A protein has these predicted regions:
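N-terminal ligand-binding lobe of clamshell/alpha-beta domains
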Residues: 1-138
Length: 138
């Protein structure tokens, strides 16, 4: 079926590429991310990204700003709660020492495409892979 074909196509295209340190941000205050038990972690891994918080054994852990800075992600991807890029995603611009910021790899994916597990998750997965791939190419 279409879902399985699309999934297999994404696996074939992205799953064996060089790893990219990835920070996925769900919310601003507190900073909420995806831990190792969240589907988002699996999506990041499918894209050959490395979730910088994969070792946290929670679905949606709160993390500190310092932890993100220390991990120094190569790409930052946020979702928020609406269809447009949340203003708080621009906050990272004040941290030019972060590789994702200095190389302009801060992206938005609408939450309906990645935070609600439906067939549309494949659309969000493709966007995730494309964003991670941009950081890989640089």
């Amino acid at each position: 079926n279409y879902f399985n074909q699309t999934y297999e196509s994404l696996v074939t295209e992205y799953s064996n590429r060089e790893s990219v340190k990835t920070f996925y941000q769900v919310w601003e205050s507190p900073i909420i991310t995806a831990g190792g038990k969240e589907l988002m972690n699996d999506i990041i891994e499918l894209c050959s990204g490395e979730n910088i918080f994969k070792d946290i054994d929670q679905i949606a852990p709160k993390v500190s700003l310092e932890a993100v800075i220390i991990a120094n992600p190569e790409v930052i991807i946020g979702s928020g709660a609406g269809l447009t890029k949340p203003e708080w995603l621009n906050y990272w611009e004040i941290w030019p020492s972060l590789k994702a910021v200095s190389e302009e790899h801060v992206y938005f994916i609408p939450p309906d495409l990645v935070q609600r597990q439906t067939p549309r998750t494949l659309i969000g997965t493709k966007q995730m892979c494309e964003h991670i791939d941009k950081a890989r190419v640089d």
